[in-house]
Amino acid sequence: GGTADLATYDDDGAVYVQRIKIEGKYFAFNEKGQMQDGLQYCKADGGFYYFDDNGYQKTGRVTSVENDDDDYTFYFNTKNGKNGQGYKGIKDDYLYFNGKRQDADDDYRLFYYDGDIYLTNTKGKIQKSSKKYDIENKGIAEDDVKVEISSKKVQSVETSTKKYTADDLKEIAEAQFGDAKVTDDAIVSIAENLDFLPASQSARWEDIGRKKY
């Protein structure tokens, strides 16, 4: 009970980060009362938030957010009771999870989120056209494979030897994730192999953007 319920954890043990409103502005503090900046997971609020160098909580699109020793683009809610919380889902044709834009590394990448398969480019933009794409996947040796897309959702991926339906891709994603069912509290990057292998590139709700102290 008590404040222990509000703890998140890193390699060094418990880390308590809470959002506190001061004169109409939100700030983040650790268990020692020290103001925090950067990307923070606030368990009591159930999400990720970003605080600038002055400690102010940011909303909207934020570029160059440090995460896993690299910089990414994030989007943080601006309304609807989740002000400042990392956005989950599609916004302006970009795919986000816990605020982090889901970018391909070099070409195009498949993602399984909330029951559907999406294909994004290096800027996290969801592709809408059915055509050939160079997909980042260790199981695809060909440079270009045919991807059928309808209403932004991938319907099938066809290599020279096999066609994978959306249902096939969902099963592959769930096998990679290691759970019976991937919920909307997770996103799976289908980048390892188009086979049923336990080689997960998945990211659970609390495992994205964890800041170490």
Model-derived features: positions:
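Extracellular adhesion/carbohydrate-binding repeat motifs centered on closely spaced tryptophans
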Residues: 1-213
